């Protein structure tokens, strides 16, 4: 009996890890990966950090260059897909080639959510999703240049830190009343706001751009009435999933390809993962997790589901952010206002804990990354704590 052919569409973390997971889980059939980028699949997190700060930055490949040939995975780089071929099971490229598939994994990521007012600036306005974006930003983030960043989420703050370290004059504009409002708890939001302000970043909350004039410098008029002059304008206000191919194939979409918890779409032969996917939970709600670890997890889940194997157990959600000399790691549930703090954030060493009825459900570490491993185990096991003991620095965490 002829083994099935699996095609992976995408060139990022989820795509590469799906290939690795399929081989690790025993798939020996024909395996192809199609990507519109000419690079081997590379890590995205360094784009806003080391790719802007190091003297001679290099893309960090998800898998070693020799892995692909050694594992008999056929790479098709720099190609554009015309149709997924849901009915014919034939992937069609814009160059006319067609490729048969029995199962398909879509991991084509997302684009920056557009902001037409700034997009009209053309090459003077920047977003950050790919290696080419980072290379262009690196060229323009020069000392003493005025940089305006729209959006104070994770990417916006990481870019603010990198631009400041490149000795730019940075202003951040945020519509909300706080920074990192979607994915950090209140005490961490306050810490980050103060950290950036101390570094010289001007952060304008509860504000937005109303009018833009392109001249020798870009003139930005804000809702508050203030006018800013900028040499460089960057924005990061969320993502827009690259779902067009899926829509054209009549797959369910909702700013993302709708999948179940096995990463399966409405077509049982088609799976999706990473930023392009959005999960319909058991209660009907739609949930997207935009993180490096989620891309890895969904790649492993999809591979297992494709092969009819038991699905791996998911660890608590985890992501990290590097800003200035700080490493922050977020794990578990970030909701809620009653967080405990172990240590003193002013010394740039602390851990915030989220206890619910004594059960640890979430935590954020500040330059204490070594503690993430035990914290992960505690969250997974539903361990209960005495709050006073948890924040007592005289008691080693590992002894609790």
UniProtKB/Swiss-Prot annotation:
NAD(+) binds at residues 146-174. The gene is hcaD. Belongs to the bacterial ring-hydroxylating dioxygenase ferredoxin reductase family. Disulfide bonds: none annotated. The keyword DNA-binding does not apply. Part of the multicomponent 3-phenylpropionate dioxygenase, that converts 3-phenylpropionic acid (PP) and cinnamic acid (CI) into 3-phenylpropionate-dihydrodiol (PP-dihydrodiol) and cinnamic acid-dihydrodiol (CI-dihydrodiol), respectively. It catalyses: 2 reduced [2Fe-2S]-[ferredoxin] + NAD(+) + H(+) = 2 oxidized [2Fe-2S]-[ferredoxin] + NADH. It comes from Shigella sonnei (strain Ss046). This is 3-phenylpropionate/cinnamic acid dioxygenase ferredoxin--NAD(+) reductase component. FAD binds at residues 5-36.
């Amino acid at each position: 009996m002829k083994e099935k052919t699996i095609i992976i569409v995408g060139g990022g973390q989820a795509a590469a890890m799906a290939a690795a997971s399929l081989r690790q889980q025993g798939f020996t059939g024909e395996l192809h990966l199609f990507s519109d980028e000419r690079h081997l699949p590379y890590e995205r997190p360094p784009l806003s950090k080391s790719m802007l700060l190091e003297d001679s930055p290099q893309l960090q490949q998800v898998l070693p260059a020799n892995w692909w040939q050694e594992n008999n995975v056929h790479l098709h780089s720099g190609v554009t897909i015309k149709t997924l071929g849901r009915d014919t099971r034939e992937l069609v490229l814009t160059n006319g080639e067609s490729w048969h598939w029995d199962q398909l994994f879509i991991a084509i990521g997302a684009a920056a959510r557009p902001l037409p007012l700034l997009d009209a600036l053309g090459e003077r306005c920047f977003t950050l999703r790919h290696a080419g974006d980072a290379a262009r930003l690196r060229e323009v983030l020069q000392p003493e240049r005025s940089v305006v960043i729209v959006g104070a989420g994770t990417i916006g703050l990481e870019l603010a830190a990198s631009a400041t370290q490149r000795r730019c004059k940075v202003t951040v504009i945020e519509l909300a009343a706080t920074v990192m409002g979607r994915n950090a708890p209140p005490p961490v939001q306050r810490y980050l706001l103060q950290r950036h302000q101390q570094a010289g970043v001007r952060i304008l909350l509860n504000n937005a751009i109303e009018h833009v004039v392109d001249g020798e410098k870009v003139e930005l008029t804000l809702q508050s009435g203030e006018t800013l002059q900028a040499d460089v304008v960057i924005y990061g206000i969320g993502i827009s999933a690259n779902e067009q191919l899926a829509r054209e194939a009549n797959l369910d979409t909702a700013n993302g390809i709708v999948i179940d918890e096995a990463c399966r779409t409405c077509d049982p032969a088609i799976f999706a993962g990473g930023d392009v996917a959005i999960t319909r939970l058991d209660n009907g709600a739609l949930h997207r997790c935009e993180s490096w670890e989620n891309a890895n997890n969904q790649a492993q889940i999809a591979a297992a589901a494709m092969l009819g194997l038991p699905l791996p157990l998911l660890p608590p959600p985890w992501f990290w952010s590097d800003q200035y000399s700080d490493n922050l790691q977020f794990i578990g549930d970030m909701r809620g206002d009653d967080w405990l703090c172990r240590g003193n954030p002013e010394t740039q060493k602390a851990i915030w804990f989220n206890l619910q009825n004594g059960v640890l459900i979430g935590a954020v570490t500040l330059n204490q990354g070594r503690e993430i491993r035990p914290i992960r185990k505690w969250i997974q096991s539903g361990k209960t704590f005495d709050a006073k003991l948890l924040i007592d620095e005289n008691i080693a965490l590992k002894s609790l």
